[in-house]
Regions:
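Residues within well-ordered beta-strands of beta-sheet-rich folds
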Residues: 76-78, 115-117, 156-158
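Short, surface-exposed loop and linker segments with low hydrophobicity and enrichment for Pro/Ser/Thr
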Residues: 1-6, 63-70, 97-113
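Solvent-exposed edge beta-strands and adjacent loop segments
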Residues: 2-83, 131-151
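Short, compositionally biased strand/turn segments
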Residues: 1, 10, 14-18, 109-121
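Short solvent-exposed strand/turn elements
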Residues: 151-166
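Short leucine-rich amphipathic alpha-helical surface patches
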Residues: 118-120, 142, 161
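Short, acidic/charged, Gly/Pro-enriched secondary-structure junctions
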Residues: 81, 89-135
Length: 167
C-alpha cells in the first residue's frame, strides 16, 4: 500500500485526565496551532584499536562502534490563550472537551503526571489509527501577549518512562 500523508489539521496532542495512559478520559490540548513529538536515543560509543594484516597495531587509529543507550521523548504545542475559560477543569459539570491554557497551567503548577497521546484526532474518537502514548509532566509553559495580536502559549510535556506505539 502506498504511503498517504496525514493532514496536520487532523493530528493533535491529547491528555488523559486520570494521570495514566489508559485512554479513558482524553481531552485535546485546546486551541493549538501546532504540535510536535520528539524522540531521542542517547548513543554510546566504543573505540577499538585496529590490527594490521600482519598482526601489528595499526598506526592510523581504530574503529568507533555506536549503539542506542537510554531514550527520552517530549511533546510540545503552541496555541491561543483563552483566559475567560474558567470551566476547563477536570471533571467539572461544564468541563470542555479540551485542556485550555488555564488547565495546562494548573497541571504545571501542581506537577501533575498525565497520560499523553500524539495521534490523529479521529483516533481519539475510537478509530484505530497509529499514534504514540506515554506518561509525562509539563516541563514548561509560557504565555505571551503582543500589541494587536492574539495571546499565545507554548507548552512542553517531558516524557516519564517509555513511549509506546498505538497500533
Amino acid at each position: 500500500m502506498a504511503l498517504v500523508p496525514t493532514s496536520g489539521n487532523k493530528v493533535g496532542i491529547f491528555v488523559d485526565n486520570d494521570n495514566a495512559a489508559s485512554g479513558d478520559a482524553l481531552r485535546l490540548v485546546g486551541l493549538a496551532t501546532s504540535c510536535s513529538l520528539s524522540y531521542n536515543n542517547a548513543t554510546v560509543e566504543t573505540a577499538t584499536k585496529s590490527v594490521n594484516g600482519g598482526g601489528t597495531l595499526a598506526t592510523n587509529g581504530g574503529t568507533i562502534n555506536s549503539f542506542a543507550g537510554t531514550s527520552s521523548f517530549s511533546l510540545s504545542a503552541d496555541g491561543l490563550v483563552d483566559l475567560s475559560t474558567a470551566d476547563d477543569e477536570d471533571g467539572g459539570a461544564s468541563a470542555t472537551t479540551e485542556h485550555g491554557f488555564n488547565n495546562l497551567m494548573d497541571m504545571a503548577i501542581a506537577g501533575t503526571k498525565v497520560g499523553i497521546y500524539f495521534q490523529d484526532a479521529t483516533a481519539a474518537g475510537g478509530t484505530a489509527n497509529k499514534g504514540y502514548t506515554g506518561t509525562a509532566f509539563i516541563e514548561s509553559i509560557e504565555a505571551s501577549a503582543g500589541v494587536d495580536d492574539f495571546a499565545t502559549y507554548s507548552v512542553t510535556f517531558k516524557g516519564d518512562g517509555a513511549l509506546s506505539v498505538i497500533a
